[in-house]
């Protein structure tokens, strides 16, 4: 299935502006309102997948509910009917601009002032979204645009969820491999998320626009996700010169691992950004520099040593006291020695035999993306082995289950096999051409497919009621859960012949081409029309015929004139009039007719009748009154 060039007879699609994980965005023209728009269309290969179809519709619902100047507006939604089924689309405001990702990649880090202004506007957009019950869940530089007028626009609520539905992991609705650098720790663990998760992701974006790189990078999404959960970010000022400690404080508070330690709303984060922009200290705690940290530790160490005291005066001991003192010291030395030996023995035992193992319950990671599931299991101390399997119910790169199974108690450090879905089993579509629909269903069922839909399409007469193709096509692999559209021949397409009388042959043929007719013949006919002009067709205009029919164009010889009304005229007046029209033929004067005295010698009968075509060299019959 391909994307049509027009949607709902209103939107004319133009160039592709970009691609997403499940859609493509076109520049389009709204033919009704005469304005440019951006149209997001679900990828044709995903349109038949119910999970992607529902997710795309959820994006439309979420985005349409958000009317804010810093959020890309949604104008319309709909579904285009195609031979393969409905194709959903979203019509959005067209923003002529660039994304933060493109700006950082081409121009490098922003100035602190500009970065604060941009992210503060993004905070307003997200706060509005959160107040309306929608968490974005995929905040990243590629989803924030700067328009040609420097307006900030947050877009792509493709995996957004209502807050009431946020108990599900982000990865239960979309793979996050492409956005691992902006995941919150709770997203990386597969825990439930709330508005503070968007705050963390926006903190990652602020970090990147200030320094030119995200807070965490790695060789794989799993390693990046692990850092989000376990590692502290390097302060931005240590990555890029010219950044203040106050700006460090705002960024690092947004990037707090524990959501309770972050800004609780995007509005709080914006308020601190405004303070820093105005030269005021933020409410976020200041981050100590290395020098300040060293000075503080040195001061603390000095306080722990305590005030200096003078030594006690030495006292002389007698022999008994001296022996008692020596004996006491000896006993304490022995005790300390024994404890030291025990410590060494216990340490060796732990290192040698692994110490006391503890049982850990295997978490339930079914339905999570493989990256999130692996991070969750590794955080529990498990070793991981992955095994890929086809599955009709779990999306690709998401977890089918684990071995041992979820909620099983195992020893910490054990190996867990993570069964990762490759999606529904793929099989080859057999060729069912020329079969009946029932025969085609039987053959496709034997090949492992189980969902079918019939579509009719014009065909040659001999293929009426026979299969002329499938979608997906024969010999192409497809998921066994996909609907196979069986296209049955309905015979030649039919059209009504339009009226082309009065047109030249070339113009008439072009107009007939518009209706689908391509086969023509010509016949010269007597006609008063100018020579070469079409007088009609055979079959006549208005007749419904197959589009592959031969249409005969009847072309005027230009050899006739229209017979005038000669009634009541004397012959001496009638003849010049006929000659003036080009008549060169003979007069057939019939017997006079008794028509009363007033009609004496006047025309009382003519053949051909008035208004009909007469050959210029033809015979005209007239009768006169007596």
UniProtKB/Swiss-Prot annotation:
Residue list for modification N-acetylthreonine: 2
Binding site for Mg(2+): 143, 156
Compositional bias of kind Basic and acidic residues: 311-323
InterPro entries: Kinase-like_dom_sf, PASTA_dom, Prot_kinase_dom, Protein_kinase_ATP_BS, Ser/Thr_kinase_AS
CDD domains in the record: PASTA_pknB (cd06577), STKc_PknB_like (cd14014)
Alphabetical UniProt keywords: Acetylation, ATP-binding, Cell membrane, Kinase, Magnesium, Membrane, Metal-binding, Nucleotide-binding, Phosphoprotein, Repeat, Serine/threonine-protein kinase, Transferase, Transmembrane, Transmembrane helix, Virulence
Residue ranges annotated as Cytoplasmic topological domain: 2-332
Membrane topology recorded in Swiss-Prot or TrEMBL: Single-pass membrane protein
Highest rank taxon of the organism: Bacteria
Keyword presence, Nuclease: no
Segments passing through the bilayer: 333-353
Expression induction: Expressed predominantly in exponential phase. PknB levels are regulated in response to hypoxia; its expression is down-regulated during hypoxia and recovers to aerated levels upon reaeration (at mRNA and protein level).
Residues binding ATP: 17-25, 40, 93-95, 140-143, 156
In-chain residues carrying the UniProt-annotated modification Phosphoserine: 166, 169, 295
GO aspect biological process, one term: negative regulation of fatty acid biosynthetic process
Regulation: Interaction of the PASTA domains with peptidoglycan leads to septal and polar localization of PknB, and dimerization of the intracellular kinase domain. Dimerization activates the kinase domain via an allosteric mechanism, triggering autophosphorylation and phosphorylation of target proteins. Inhibited by mitoxantrone. Inhibition prevents mycobacterial growth.
Protein name per its UniProtKB record: Serine/threonine-protein kinase PknB
Gene source species: Mycobacterium tuberculosis (strain ATCC 25618 / H37Rv)
């Amino acid at each position: 299935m391909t994307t049509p060039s027009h949607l709902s007879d209103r939107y004319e699609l133009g160039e592709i502006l970009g691609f997403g994980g499940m859609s493509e965005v076109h520049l389009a023209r709204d033919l009704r309102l005469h304005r440019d728009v951006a149209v997001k269309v679900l990828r044709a290969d995903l349109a038949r997948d119910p999970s992607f179809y529902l997710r795309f519709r959820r994006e439309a619902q979420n985005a349409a509910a958000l009317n804010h100047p810093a959020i890309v507006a949604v104008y319309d939604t709909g579904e285009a009917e195609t031979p393969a089924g409905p194709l959903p689309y979203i019509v959005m405001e067209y923003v002529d601009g660039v994304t933060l990702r493109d700006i950082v990649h081409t121009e490098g880090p922003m100035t602190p002032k500009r970065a604060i202004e941009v992210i503060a506007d993004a905070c307003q957009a997200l706060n509005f979204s959160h107040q309306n019950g929608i968490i974005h869940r995929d905040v990243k530089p590629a989803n924030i645009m700067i328009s040609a007028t420097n307006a900030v626009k947050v877009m792509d609520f493709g995996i957004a969820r209502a807050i009431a539905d946020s108990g599900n992991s982000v990865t239960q609705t979309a793979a996050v491999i492409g956005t691992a650098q902006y995941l919150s720790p709770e997203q990386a663990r597969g825990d439930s998320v709330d508005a503070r998760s968007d705050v963390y992701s926006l903190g990652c974006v602020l970090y990147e626009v200030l320094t030119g790189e995200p807070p965490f990078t790695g060789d794989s999404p799993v390693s990046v996700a692990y850092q989000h959960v376990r590692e502290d970010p390097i302060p931005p000022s240590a990555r890029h010169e010219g950044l203040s400690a106050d700006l460090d404080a705002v960024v690092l508070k947004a990037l707090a691992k524990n959501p309770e330690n972050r800004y609780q709303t995007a509005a709080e984060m914006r308020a601190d950004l405004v303070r820093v922009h105005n030269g005021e200290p933020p409410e976020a705690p200041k981050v100590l520099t290395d020098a300040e940290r060293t000075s503080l530790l040195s001061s603390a160490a000095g306080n722990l040593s305590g005030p200096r005291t003078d030594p006690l005066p030495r006292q002389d001991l007698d022999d008994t006291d001296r022996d008692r003192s020596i004996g006491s010291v000896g006993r304490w030395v022995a005790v300390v020695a024994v404890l030291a030996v025990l410590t060494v023995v216990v340490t060796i035992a732990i290192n040698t035999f692994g110490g006391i193992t503890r049982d850990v319950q295997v978490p339930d990671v079914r339905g999570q993306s493989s990256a999130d599931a692996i991070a969750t299991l590794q955080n529990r101390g498990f070793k991981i082995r992955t095994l890929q399997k086809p599955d009709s119910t779990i999306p690709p790169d998401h977890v089918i289950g684990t071995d041992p199974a979820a909620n099983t108690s195992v020893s910490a450090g054990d190996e867990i096999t993570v069964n990762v879905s490759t999606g529904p089993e793929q099989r080859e579509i057999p060729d069912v051409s020329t079969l009946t629909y029932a025969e085609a269903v039987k053959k496709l069922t034997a090949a492992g497919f189980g969902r079918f839909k019939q579509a009719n399409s014009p065909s040659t007469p001999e293929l009426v009621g026979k299969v002329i193709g499938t979608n997906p096509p024969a010999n192409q692999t497809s998921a066994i859960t996909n609907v196979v559209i069986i296209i049955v021949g309905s015979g030649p397409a039919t059209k009504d012949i339009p009226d082309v009388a009065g047109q030249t042959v070339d113009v008439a043929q072009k107009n007939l081409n518009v209706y689908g007719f391509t086969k023509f013949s010509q016949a010269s006919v007597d006609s008063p029309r100018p020579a070469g002009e079409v007088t009609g067709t055979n079959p006549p205009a208005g007749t419904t015929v197959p589009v592959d029919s031969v249409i005969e164009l009847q072309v005027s010889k230009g050899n006739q004139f229209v017979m005038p009304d000669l009634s009541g005229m004397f012959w001496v007046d009638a003849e010049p009039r006929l000659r003036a029209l080009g008549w060169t033929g003979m007069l057939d004067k019939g017997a006079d007719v008794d028509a009363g005295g007033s009609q004496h010698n006047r025309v009382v009968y003519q053949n051909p009748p008035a208004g009909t075509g007469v050959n210029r060299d033809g015979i005209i019959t007239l009768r006169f009154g007596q």
